[in-house]
């Protein structure tokens, strides 16, 4: 009897692992890359370009509504700025699904200046944000397609944050949209989450961001274990640094959220050279498969 129980347990665990791999393998890096291209073609997603912001919001909703249980636009104000966070929920009908509710997030705005440009004449120009802005969104939109095809075992929230990249401009801070989201949704307390930021570089390197490591270590260990199994070499065993990003507002209220972000920042970061040619479908696919496996694991 004991032998049969062990055998049955082994089979169940094997099936679970196989399902996780099967679903994550459906992530298509080329589809994700196309999402980056389409966002970039709208132009900089900044307050002074409202048409590009409207087009991007409409685009994201268009690719979420057929799949998500519900989508919600949450407008917010901060000082004299107006922003919109987009929230898509995939409700799972699995038993105890809400006890393991997971948040996946990315910012969808872009930097309105390019202060890292070597050419001083270009520093006042906005960045297109192919990597820093569009790449995280692209991964989430492709994941949404997979979640619709294969209902996940947990309830998922995909949240697209506005006004992340206004930091150090006129005294503003980074991660405004996520701060406002946490402030305005005090009832929302998922068991954990992942932020995706700058995840398409052709030479992608994701070390262990230190706020995440210090305050969400168990979740980070799970992610890196999956990455090791998948031979996702972009996930480095080395420590990065402390980065101000959309995970911090969640960490401050006790929600363990891991920031997956390229570091050191690439040389085109916050310049006009953050363009589509810097992006790799292979990098997008590697990150997307790891996150998908985390969901189905």
Residue map of PLM features:
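Active-site-adjacent substrate-binding region
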Residues: 73, 192, 201-297
């Amino acid at each position: 009897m004991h032998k049969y129980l062990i055998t049955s347990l082994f089979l169940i665990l094997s099936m679970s692992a196989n399902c996780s791999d099967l679903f994550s393998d459906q992530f298509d890096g080329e589809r994700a890359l196309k999402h980056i291209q389409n966002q970039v073609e709208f132009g900089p997603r900044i307050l002074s370009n409202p048409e590009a912001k409207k087009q991007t919001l409409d685009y994201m909703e268009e690719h979420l509504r057929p799949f998500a249980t519900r989508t919600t636009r949450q407008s917010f104000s901060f000082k004299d700025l107006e922003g919109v966070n987009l929230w898509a929920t995939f409700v799972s009908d699995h038993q105890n699904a809400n006890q393991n509710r997971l948040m996946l997030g990315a910012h969808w705005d872009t930097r309105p200046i390019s202060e890292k440009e070597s050419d001083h004449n270009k520093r006042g120009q906005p960045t297109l944000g192919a990597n820093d802005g569009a790449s995280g969104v692209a991964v989430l939109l492709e994941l949404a397609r997979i979640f619709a095809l294969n209902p996940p075992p947990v309830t998922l929230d995909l949240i697209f944050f506005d006004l992340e990249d206004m930091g150090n401009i006129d005294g503003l801070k980074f991660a405004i949209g996520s701060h406002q989201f946490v402030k305005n949704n005090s009832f929302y307390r998922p068991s954990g989450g992942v932020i995706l930021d700058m995840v398409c570089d052709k030479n992608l390197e994701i070390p262990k961001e230190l706020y995440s490591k210090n305050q969400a270590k168990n979740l980070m260990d799970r992610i890196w274990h999956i990455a090791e199994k998948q031979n996702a070499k972009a996930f480095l065993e080395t420590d990065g640094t402390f980065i101000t990003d959309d995970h911090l507002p969640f960490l401050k209220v006790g929600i363990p959220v891991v920031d997956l972000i390229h570091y050191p920042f690439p040389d085109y970061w916050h310049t006009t050279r953050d363009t589509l040619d810097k992006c790799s479908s292979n990098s997008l696919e590697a990150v997307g498969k790891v996150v998908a496996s985390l969901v189905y694991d």
